[in-house]
């Protein structure tokens, strides 16, 4: 009994190893099935719309016919076709001329290059920090103006100095005017001297009185 038990254990381990070896093969097969074969739906739609020569656009029914003619399974991938049309319209590669949503007619946009250029332009909010840098030179440019105003202020200071010199120049005129009354005073002094002379002439008038006294003495 002890000899037969170890022989049964390896027999059970062998089928388990075979099952583990088969599982990776199934996983590899699943990975191969998931890989997309051929171009995407959006590429097929753009090719079909660009190939059409209709001015009003390619209808959904005509688009499905073109895709089926190219070997695409339209019945299985009907939902993918509609999603692809909506995404192309939202991106701007296709323009919907009729209908709404995925139904209607579609054509290529006239200027697809401009639409692609506009999308990256919207992604430039990083240029906003440059505005404060542009304001700094403006403030720096304002400072020299203030300095220029400070330089102009000495001119204003010079004007009061010039006014002071003018006032100083005018002051001698006032001094000369004040000196003129002194000349008048000196001119008046001879008049006073002239007035003194008649006072000295009064003793001459006393002589007649002495003559009268002599006449009175002679009469006696």
From Swiss-Prot:
Organism of derivation: Gallus gallus
Identification of the protein by name: Histone H1.10
Taxon lineage: Eukaryota, Metazoa, Chordata, Craniata, Vertebrata
Family label: Belongs to the histone H1/H5 family.
Gene3D superfamilies the record matches: Winged helix-like DNA-binding domain superfamily/Winged helix DNA-binding domain
Alphabetical UniProt keywords: Acetylation, Chromosome, DNA-binding, Nucleus
Compositionally biased spans, kind Basic residues: 119-134, 142-159, 167-185, 194-220
Region (Disordered): 1-40, 85-220
PTM sites of type N-acetylserine: 2
Primary role: Histones H1 are necessary for the condensation of nucleosome chains into higher-order structures.
